[in-house]
């Protein structure tokens, strides 16, 4: 039986409001990034951040050539964090790794007020850039969308994230073209597809693929700068090769079964399951996420053997975990 446990609420405190930027970076520095990993946030059995495991994950990314990390994004379960947790994790990442990798904090919100406040604090603790989603659920007009993004673009380098499958609203190209007038727009993380990516690159707008299964073709056939990747949590070296090594359909085909497996259920369910089976994080899930069923866990172990254990993060033998091995945390 999967265990459901409560957690102690962490005693985090937001930094004081500040307009002094600790780690000023130009948008051009962000535009140059080819491999950005949407980093996983691991947990202790009581639901608090497992910072030791987190540091190991980031170090493995640095060691395998990732150039940036998204902190507290969809993959990092920012939607399950308080803002206090959010900012403390960004600050921790900057303090420990900011000299070795670009730290991009997900400080977006469907509330413009919250997005402004979180972004101020993210830059105050030293993040190099902000990631911003368009307002979701309480959707606005296109004019409202432009006003929302302009409110945060003034603060520093910004990546705009378009994923209508999650937000319920596409950011159309003319909105991005309007926002491109801002010197702080580093680019767009685009999940609509490669035709949209080509449209932006033709307009001189930097764009990263947000889809691991399309990123090879996006990079080498449609002009994408690189990828914001989930799969690189597992195989950072191979994803770097995919982004830096030129056209490589053989490697792309080798990775597609793993990528398909990762997104069989909504992200980050597959990734959380995989990292636990690799032994690099504890098998702890913050609800409402739960592990993949046992047949998919077996499938992952087989994929690791087919691709080669040496290409995956960590050095433990991949395991097929039982239901009893997992902790589900509902209060933290």
Swiss-Prot record:
Residues the record marks as site: Part of a proton relay during catalysis: 74, 137
Keywords assigned by UniProt, alphabetized: Amino-acid biosynthesis, Chloroplast, Diaminopimelate biosynthesis, Lyase, Lysine biosynthesis, Plastid, Schiff base, Transit peptide
GO terms assigned for molecular function: 4-hydroxy-tetrahydrodipicolinate synthase activity
Compartment annotation: Plastid, Chloroplast
Reactions the enzyme catalyzes: L-aspartate 4-semialdehyde + pyruvate = (2S,4S)-4-hydroxy-2,3,4,5-tetrahydrodipicolinate + H2O + H(+)
Enzymatic class: lyase
Pathway listed: Amino-acid biosynthesis; L-lysine biosynthesis via DAP pathway; (S)-tetrahydrodipicolinate from L-aspartate: step 3/4
GO BP annotation list: diaminopimelate biosynthetic process; lysine biosynthetic process via diaminopimelate
Binding, pyruvate: 75, 228
GO cellular component, one term: chloroplast
Residues of the active site: 161 (proton donor/acceptor), 189 (schiff-base intermediate with substrate)
Top-rank lineage group of the source organism: Eukaryota
CDD domains linked: DHDPS
Its EC number(s): 4.3.3.7
Function in brief: Catalyzes the condensation of (S)-aspartate-beta-semialdehyde [(S)-ASA] and pyruvate to 4-hydroxy-tetrahydrodipicolinate (HTPA).
Record-stated family: Belongs to the DapA family.
Protein name in UniProt: 4-hydroxy-tetrahydrodipicolinate synthase, chloroplastic
């Amino acid at each position: 039986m999967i265990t459901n446990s409560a957690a102690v609420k962490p005693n985090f405190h937001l930094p004081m409001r500040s307009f002094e930027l600790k780690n000023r970076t130009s948008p051009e520095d962000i535009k140059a990034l080819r491999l950005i990993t949407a980093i996983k946030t691991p947990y202790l059995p009581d639901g608090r951040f497992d910072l030791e495991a987190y540091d190991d994950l980031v170090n493995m990314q640095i060691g395998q050539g990732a150039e940036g990390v998204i902190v507290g994004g969809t993959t990092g379960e920012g939607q399950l964090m308080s803002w206090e947790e959010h900012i403390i994790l960004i600050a921790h990442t900057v303090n420990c790794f900011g000299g070795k990798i670009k730290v991009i904090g997900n400080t977006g919100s469907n509330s413009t007020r919250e997005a402004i406040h979180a972004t101020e604090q993210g830059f105050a603790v030293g993040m190099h850039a902000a990631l911003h989603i368009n307002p979701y659920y309480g959707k606005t007009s296109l004019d409202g969308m432009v006003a929302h993004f302009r409110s945060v673009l003034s603060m520093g380098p910004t990546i705009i994230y378009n994923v209508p499958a999650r937000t319920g609203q596409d950011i159309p190209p003319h909105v991005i073209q309007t926002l491109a007038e801002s010197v702080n727009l580093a680019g767009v993380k685009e999940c609509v597809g490669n035709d949209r990516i080509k449209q932006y690159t033709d307009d001189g707008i930097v764009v990263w693929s947000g889809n691991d299964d399309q990123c090879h073709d996006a990079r080498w056939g449609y002009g994408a700068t690189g990828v914001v990747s989930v799969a690189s949590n597992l195989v950072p070296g191979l994803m770097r090769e995919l982004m830096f090594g030129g056209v490589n359909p053989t490697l792309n085909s080798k990775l597609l079964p793993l990528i398909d497996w990762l997104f069989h259920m909504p992200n980050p369910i597959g990734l959380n399951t995989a990292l636990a089976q690799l032994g690099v994080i504890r098998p702890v899930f913050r609800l409402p996420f739960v592990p993949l069923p046992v047949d998919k866990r077996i499938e992952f172990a087989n994929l690791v053997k087919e691709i080669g254990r040496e290409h995956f993060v960590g050095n433990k033998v991949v395991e097929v975990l039982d239901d009893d091995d997992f902790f589900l945390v509902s209060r933290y």
